[in-house]
């Protein structure tokens, strides 16, 4: 390795105390959740409080740690300053609608109209997932928040929500000037919240989203860790993801290459040898393409990485580069 090349570890993330938001993403099946859990464990050793959030509908955090997590943050057994939560996007919007409908009366008609408007917005379930995150984060004070994201395409949509929601809420606020009095007479007369209260809440949400949007584009506060395996499709997805992140002005300078094979000397396994050669070809391409990135190389594990102890052991590979010793 060139002496001028960035260190092949995620120690740079651990050392960057200013980081507030860390996204971990990649193609499905590359070890994204294992990496995000392991990074969270390492950060918990250096930060006062860490929150790990799953925005992947599959929700593998519970399986990884071997304990049940839900929409409210809960501490990881044995690591008191690390909390996890799993967000159900569809549940978030359904809960909002049910709460609004419970008011009944004439306001229910307005609720149905708002429901129709809400569901006509592309990606609204994921947007509500983002709103759920904001609500949770605003009521707490975690030092750093890590997102175990959905597979690649969903991840990038999630990162654009601050901009999308900011524009949408801006338009809704404009409508308040034109229809505010009418909504006030419809809603206020039913003993529910007034239109002014509703629009004030929308404006408050927009301000929060705008603030977070600015933070996402600040490399001192936000970074994205790409996880891949040394195969063509994964490399292709990673390149597309890096380009998209760059176009969104979101910092990314760390890539984790997972599931690397290291056949033993004298091993006559033809399949192992063939896969090793293929992996080395794509690993070289990754090293050439991203020479200014921190590229972490992780070996294929002989057993599933599940439970706190196994994750702690695996997490050391993120900060202490793996050294293969031939027998």
Curated annotation (Swiss-Prot):
This is ATPase GET3. The lineage of its organism: Eukaryota, Fungi, Dikarya, Ascomycota, Saccharomycotina. Its main location: cytoplasm. ATPase required for the post-translational delivery of tail-anchored (TA) proteins to the endoplasmic reticulum. Recognizes and selectively binds the transmembrane domain of TA proteins in the cytosol. This complex then targets to the endoplasmic reticulum by membrane-bound receptors GET1 and GET2, where the tail-anchored protein is released for insertion. This process is regulated by ATP binding and hydrolysis. ATP binding drives the homodimer towards the closed dimer state, facilitating recognition of newly synthesized TA membrane proteins. ATP hydrolysis is required for insertion. Keywords: ATP-binding, Cytoplasm, Endoplasmic reticulum, Golgi apparatus, Hydrolase, Metal-binding, Nucleotide-binding, Transport, Zinc. GO terms for cellular component: GET complex; Golgi apparatus. It holds the Pfam family ArsA_ATPase. InterPro entries: Anion-transp_ATPase-like_dom, ATPase_ArsA/GET3, ATPase_ArsA/GET3_euk, P-loop_NTPase. Coiled coil: none annotated. GO terms for biological process: tail-anchored membrane protein insertion into ER membrane. ATP binds at residues 27-34, 231, 258. Homodimer. Component of the Golgi to ER traffic (GET) complex, which is composed of GET1, GET2 and GET3. Within the complex, GET1 and GET2 form a heterotetramer which is stabilized by phosphatidylinositol binding and which binds to the GET3 homodimer. Interacts with the chloride channel protein GEF1.
